[in-house]
């Protein structure tokens, strides 16, 4: 079983999550169960840019894939790029989309 966390705190957050979920399915990920979509506050260090303080929409999907975890990770990064995620080396930076494999 594979669990993937999906979230967004920039732009049309709900649409971003729906697009990511559809792309995930297009890449051969079979969704067996999914959580509700819920909102959480951004967690930021005290010195973070105030413009980064935007709430996230999040969800988790449970499913299966014929891909190995490393190949699945490559596909997840491809989806993030397709949805215009800006790669920042600052882990606190807002995101159009993120997809993380949960262990």
Where is each model-derived feature located?
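Core catalytic alpha/beta fold that binds nucleotide/phospho-ligands
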Residues: 1-103
